[in-house]
Amino acid sequence: ACLVGSEMCIRDRWKTNPDYPNGWFTYDAIAPELIEYVKENGYNYIELMPICEHPCDSSWGYQNTGYFSPTSRYGTAQQLMRLIDLCHQAGVGVLLDFVPVHFALDDYGLARFDGTNLYEYPHPDVGVSEWGSCNFMHSRGEVRSFLQSSAWFWLEKFHFDGLRMDAISRILYWQGDENRGVNRDGEAFLRVMNAGLKQRCPGCMLIAEDSTQYPGVTHPVETGGLGFDYKWDMGWMNDTLDFFRTPPEKRSKHYHKLTFSMLYFPRETYLLPLSHDENVHGKATILQKMYGDYEDKFPQARALYLYMMMHPG
């Protein structure tokens, strides 16, 4: 069956509700509307953007502090379990956006946990990420065990169907910079974690968000790959959206943006994303990205989604 998923940020979709004690909708409250929306729009999976406990109500949750606790903003762990169970009963799979790259700097988190750089690199050059957070030191066995245990915890205890791992280029390359070379400890960490998760939960889905040319992301660990099931095709997303922004009379010179992905798609097993990264910070919605007047945008958006559904992969 075709995998058709929708990213879900509970905070952005349901905002706040003054009728609830802490001002947020609960997992129980959103379940009926969420499932109805997903089914009506033909999705068979949802991907919950990070729900590990995190500081800052306005954030998307990518800088975690609690790797074994769902955020209490939306209710209890048991309520989240019920939400996932109801999705499964409706035939909808649930994936979790998992962040094994970096964590929040806040004092009540993992930074300098025992007064030393226990989880993070001691050198600022590689210890602090581009987002101002702490990079995990994947060379330490204790750190690897912590992250592997967290990943398994969400699959085993909450019955998530899989994990989408965020920004793995920052694990594979020092600070995500291919010119600085491969981080062999990070590379080994991903292989060991993915192999272990597949051994304990053979049916789980492991998805990599990676925009680099690192080879073998979706190849088996046994043959030297990283062991992911799918890799986001970020190049397809950027090229395709650029094409649809182009005035129609100039598109004949830009057809390569539609066809280039056909040259490399056999190398990996790709998922085609149209992700939150493309409408954050004023980048506009998919409809707004289409060229032309308001009414002209709709047929182009339909063509975009049709191309996405029919693309090989």
Language model regions located:
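Short, conserved glycine- and acidic-residue-centered signature motifs
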Residues: C2, T76, G186
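Extracellular structured ligand-interaction cores
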Residues: S6-E7, N64, T269
